[in-house]
Amino acid sequence: MDGRENDYQWAGPYLVSRQVIAVGAQSGIEQMSDLAGKTIAVQATGKPEAIFLSGGENVPAFRNVISLADRGVQYAMLDCGYVDAVAGHEEAIRQYMKDYGANFRILDEPLLTTGIGVAFSRHDTRGLAAQLTEVVAQMREDGSMEQLVGKYLEVPAHSLEVEQLEQ
């Protein structure tokens, strides 16, 4: 949703999405600044790639940013020690760790935290965004949203902390 709030009518945010950095469990890398001079792998065309290639003030000077079409390859590269870190969607990294027994550690500081919502045309007159927002609020209140998200994520509460986005 971020940066596109005025382009659409939005229902949400209803979930929190975090882009994070993962390193080997035994790595001495503790924060993003420790990645200066290191090699990181990212998925091509993803948010981490855009952030790292833009070189903002909080982005360390990497030795190399490797952009890959298949995110599974970036995880395998970290697992084999070919790169010092990977960056991507937190839940995708956690799922890889679970599925393959990978011993990664996710840095505490997220690279990007954003809300996920449902977009409707700005010109829509059916009131769907408002209706869906109301239904999602009811689902949050009665616990059914956590139950639903819990079918797909190990710790659904992290993804449901949308109130944190406004702080």
Segments and roles (model prediction):
Residues 47-66, 102-107, 136-167:
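Ligand-binding clefts/hinges and TM-proximal coupling segments of bilobed small-molecule sensing domains
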Residues 8-16, 64-66, 98, 102-112, ...:
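Short beta-strand->loop
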Residues 1-7, 51-56, 77-112:
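A ligand-binding cleft/hinge motif common to bilobed small-molecule-binding domains
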Residues 17-72, 90-94:
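Bilobed "Venus flytrap"/periplasmic-binding protein-like clamshell domains
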